[in-house]
Structure formats: C-alpha cells, structure tokens
C-alpha cells in the first residue's frame, strides 16, 4: 500500500483470500491487517486471472493497504501463544524459544488443571471447527506445566519436551514427528502429551486481542467474519 495513505478503518483476518478482500471492499476498509502472509510462497505472475493476481488487483483498485503480522505477532508479549495461555489461566509465563530474552516463539506456563479440565477450557476459548481438538494421554492426568505454540509447531516438539512441560498444545502435528517425540518421552520416563488444535482457530483468538489493542488509536476496527479454516466436515465412524 501507500505509506502516506490515511487509515480510518482496519479489517482483521487470519488469512487473505478473495472473499476476505471482497468483505474489506464492502466495509470500505482502508487496511487489511492479516496474521498470515499473503505471499507465503513466491509467485511468478500476478495476472488478474490467477488467484493471487485477482487479490492484488482488487487491493490496488480499491486503495486497500495490506499488512501481514505473522511472526511479529507470534513473539510479542501479547502474541498468539500468550493469548491462548492467558485464556487457559496459565501462570508464570515465559517464551518457549527466547530470542531475545523475554520475547520469543511459543510460551510455557504453569497450571493445576487436569487434562480434561484444560482440554475443556481450550474448547470453549477457541472457535469451533469441524476437525476439533485431537489429543493424547489420560483425562485424569494432573498437569503442572504446559507449552503452547499457536500455529504449525511440530518443529518445536523437542523444545517443548525439554522445557519440562507435561503437555504441548500446537497445530498441524504430523504423524512421524509426533510419534517420535512421544517415543522419546517414554524412553526417558516422562509423561508428555499433545493437543493438536486447528491452525486457524488457534490464531483467530489473537485477532480479538489485536482489536482490543488497536481500538485505543481511535480507528474503526472490524474482525472478518469469514472462516478461512480449510475443513468443513469430519467423518469419524466407529471402528
């Protein structure tokens, strides 16, 4: 966008899609503030007939600026993971990966909740999705320390285990990394478990925090009501 453009209305969203841009146009928003980068991977063309090109064209034609927060929102003190931790009532929060000290990806905090109590609290504090929450462990397990990385976090499975956490909450867990860390925990005699929550839902809660923070500027702030979670049904038949 134009750095000199005057901003009066901001639309907050997790992802930038054609439908989200259409909503921004209808709302007469001046800026879309997204969590995920629009061009997460490079493109060779932005012709209007392509999905990316269509979005770029609409943004330019309607003078709508676009800003993507992503890891800037992940590492801040009121970032994506911290927002989930606060909603779960975790105490003594610290970054999972500190760079620099005091800031970083993910969060680790203390709790006295059981696995069932924490999973239930998580379920009511993130948007409902078709795929829901997947987990390992026993509902009666009493937790002491929980690690969280909002968004795709299986690259930090080792750090979560080494942090002393009983439970790691993240998204997009793949079979092999998850299985390997669980086997490693068993070999070390550690009761370590996982909760896999929907990626979109995990980061949507940050939009509500961002709205609250930005409203102090006097600007008009809207949260996009378009669900960009990819999945819309789940088949889970009994064996």
Protein language model regions, located:
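Hydrophobic structural segments
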Residues: 1-239
């Amino acid at each position: 966008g134009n750095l000199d453009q005057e901003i009066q209305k901001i639309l907050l969203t997790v992802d930038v899609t054609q439908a989200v841009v259409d909503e921004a146009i209808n709302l007469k928003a001046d800026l879309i503030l997204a969590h995920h980068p629009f061009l997460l991977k490079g493109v060779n063309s932005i012709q209007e007939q392509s999905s990316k090109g269509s979005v770029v064209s609409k943004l330019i034609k309607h003078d709508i600026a676009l800003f993507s927060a992503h890891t800037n929102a992940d590492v801040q003190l009121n970032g994506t993971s911290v927002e989930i931790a606060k909603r779960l009532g975790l105490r003594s929060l610290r970054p999972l990966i500190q760079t620099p000290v005091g800031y970083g990806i993910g969060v680790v905090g203390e709790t006295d909740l059981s696995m069932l109590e924490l999973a239930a609290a998580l379920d009511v504090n993130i948007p409902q999705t078709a795929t829901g929450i997947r987990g390992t462990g026993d509902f009666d397990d009493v937790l002491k320390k929980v690690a969280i990385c909002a968004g795709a976090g299986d690259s930090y499975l080792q750090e979560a285990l080494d942090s002393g956490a009983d439970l790691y909450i993240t998204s997009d867990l793949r079979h092999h990394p998850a299985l390997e860390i669980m086997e490693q925990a068993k070999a070390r005699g550690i009761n370590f478990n996982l909760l896999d929550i929907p990626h979109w839902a995990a980061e949507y809660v940050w939009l509500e925090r961002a709205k609250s923070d930005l409203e102090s500027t006097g600007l008009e702030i809207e949260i996009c009501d378009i669900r960009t979670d990819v999945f819309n049904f789940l088949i889970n038949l009994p064996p």
